[in-house]
């Protein structure tokens, strides 16, 4: 049973609407749908929404993406959670915008935030949702791309992706991962 949904991103206004913050965007939508209360937990280095009616935490680590493992490890320790009780939501360069993938476990795939979590909690056996953001055009550096906002023409699709992913998370919470795979793993158009 999932007890914490963790959306990855970077803290600060300058990163708010960037590709790397799609996990934060989705966490906020799920927290709103579930009518959760927000608070900052210093030891966990995170903004945490407490969803009392659902026995759920929605977490936005404030350690910056590449150090997400610090916050996740503290969260697991402080709330006595197991890795299979968290669901991590994050951006994925290797999937085109509009693609969403729910996985039970797996490698980092080169994502530094996920790599930080794997190294910190000493396992890759935790569920995750990868949200495609696509790759940059040839000339643009990856770091510049992930820290850039979505283009105007991408925002309509992005809104659909965020809505779909939020519904996917609600489905996982209600029915579990196995029963949610077909619903979640989609290409949104």
UniProtKB/Swiss-Prot annotation:
Annotated function: Hydrolyzes ribosome-free peptidyl-tRNAs (with 1 or more amino acids incorporated), which drop off the ribosome during protein synthesis, or as a result of ribosome stalling. Catalyzes the release of premature peptidyl moieties from peptidyl-tRNA molecules trapped in stalled 50S ribosomal subunits, and thus maintains levels of free tRNAs and 50S ribosomes.
NCBIfam families (alphabetical): pth
Organism: Persephonella marina (strain DSM 14350 / EX-H1)
PANTHER family, per the entry: PEPTIDYL-TRNA HYDROLASE (PTHR17224:SF1)
PROSITE patterns per record: PEPT_TRNA_HYDROL_1
Cross-referenced InterPro entries: Pept_tRNA_hydro, Pept_tRNA_hydro_CS, Pept_tRNA_hydro_sf
EC numbers for this chain: 3.1.1.29
Protein name per its UniProtKB record: Peptidyl-tRNA hydrolase
Phylogenetic lineage: Bacteria, Pseudomonadati, Aquificota, Aquificia, Aquificales
Coiled coil: none
């Amino acid at each position: 049973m999932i007890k914490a949904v963790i959306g990855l991103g970077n803290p600060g206004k300058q990163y708010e609407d960037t590709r790397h913050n799609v996990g934060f965007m989705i966490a906020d939508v799920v927290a709103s749908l579930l009518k959760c209360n927000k608070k900052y937990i210093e030891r966990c280095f995170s903004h945490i929404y407490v969803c009392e009616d659902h026995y759920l935490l929605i977490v936005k680590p404030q350690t910056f993406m590449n150090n997400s493992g610090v916050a996740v490890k503290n969260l697991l320790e402080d709330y006595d959670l197991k890795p299979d009780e968290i669901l991590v939501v994050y951006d994925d360069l290797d999937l085109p915008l509009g693609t969403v993938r729910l996985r039970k476990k797996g490698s980092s795939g080169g994502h530094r935030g996920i790599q930080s979590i794997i190294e910190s909690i000493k396992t890759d056996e935790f569920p995750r949702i990868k949200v495609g953001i696509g790759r940059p055009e040839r000339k643009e550096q990856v770091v510049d791309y992930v820290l850039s906002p979505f283009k105007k023409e991408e925002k309509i699709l992005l809104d659909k992706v965020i809505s779909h992913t939020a519904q996917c998370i609600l489905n996982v919470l209600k029915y579990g991962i196995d029963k949610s795979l077909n619903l979640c793993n989609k290409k949104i158009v």
